[in-house]
Amino acid sequence: MKIAIDAMGGDYAPREIVKGALLAAEQYRLNIILVGDEEQLRAELGRSNAGGLVNIVHAPEVIEMREHPAVAVRRKKNSSIVKATQLVRDGEASALVSAGSTGAAMAAALFGLGRIKGIDRPAIAGVLPNEKGLTVLLDAGANVDCKPYHLLQFGVMGYLYAKKIFGITCPRVGLLSNGEEETKGNEVTLAAYHLLQKAGINFVGNIEGRDLFNGNVDVAVCDGFVGNVVLKAGEGLAGALFKIMKEEISKSWLAKIGTVMAEPALKGFKSRLDYAEYGGAPLLGVNGISIICHGSSTAKAVKNAIRVARESVENRLLEDIRSSIESIEVKGAGGNLVQEID
């Protein structure tokens, strides 16, 4: 399996991207294609023993965070994210991973790979830790404004993602709202509620913010505006908890002694809240596997994002989404949504 990596995208590119790619190549025995400035990439590879698992595709241009995504993707045909996407489109790579501009990664995927038939809006599937495991959250930032049938499509794709990648037999799908009652929500969520009821997935109804973290659902559906706010708030809360904990521990020598005793548990706690453990989030709904990473991804996060890409390919996630969406014709509010999803 070959995975294309946008080696120039991210706050710590190309060094951390290359390090993460090498870790993944060695651990998962994958063929990695690093896409970016060849001179810089060879310099980074010179610091390690890359072996025969890594190749370079030269891409002299980089799309910066401040650039307009769609305009930049059209103008910079030789940028690392565009070149990496083309490798997937042309069948030279099975998936791509990028820690660069989320907007550029989305635009490159839409222009280069296209949408799956029946999907109007691709969605980013983020992951949040909960008391019992994790919650898939989508959309996590791709679509600020959504129609009811967009949320329906997100629910179907999230259901399949949780089932295929996380091994959940019958994922519970909830619609994020301001109350559990069927009558709660705005015009969009009220309409989406009834569409999701008929979609042939395990829809459990409306959920509230606390349900994202108590393990009552496996998939939470919302628009990209709400999803991105939730995701960033979760990251901020996790960081604040660690800082508060450190401050409290530093106030007492007894607490410091207790910390030594509790070190294994604290490490486990930190690991569960660390976004790097989950790697990247797939852009579901495009005709290819595209994994989007946090802009500040370290080598560990990049390695785990590549793992997500590998698992998505091995579990035939794209094929399952395509066949399921087409079979139930999730094309709009008036679609036929009575067929069960296997």
Swiss-Prot record:
Please list the reactions this protein catalyses: a fatty acyl-[ACP] + phosphate = an acyl phosphate + holo-[ACP]
Coiled-coil region? none
- A single BP term in Gene Ontology: phospholipid biosynthetic process
Q: One Gene Ontology cellular component annotation?
A: cytoplasm
Keyword Electron transport on entry: no
Q: Which Pfam families match?
A: FA_synthesis
**Entries under SUPFAM superfamilies matching the protein:** Isocitrate/Isopropylmalate dehydrogenase-like (SSF53659)
Q: Which GO molecular function entries does the Swiss-Prot or TrEMBL record give?
A: phosphate:acyl-[acyl carrier protein] acyltransferase activity
Which keywords label this protein? Answer: Cytoplasm, Lipid biosynthesis, Lipid metabolism, Phospholipid biosynthesis, Phospholipid metabolism, Transferase
Q: Which Gene3D superfamilies match?
A: Isopropylmalate Dehydrogenase
Task: List the subcellular locations.
Answer: Cytoplasm
Pathway, according to UniProt?
Answer: Lipid metabolism; phospholipid metabolism
| Alphabetical list of PANTHER family matching this protein | FATTY ACID/PHOSPHOLIPID SYNTHESIS PROTEIN PLSX, PHOSPHATE ACYLTRANSFERASE
What this chain does, per the entry, is described as: Catalyzes the reversible formation of acyl-phosphate (acyl-PO(4)) from acyl-[acyl-carrier-protein] (acyl-ACP). This enzyme utilizes acyl-ACP as fatty acyl donor, but not acyl-CoA.
How it assembles, according to the record, is:
Homodimer. Probably interacts with PlsY.
- Protein's name according to its UniProt entry: Phosphate acyltransferase
From which organism does this entry originate? Pelotomaculum thermopropionicum (strain DSM 13744 / JCM 10971 / SI)
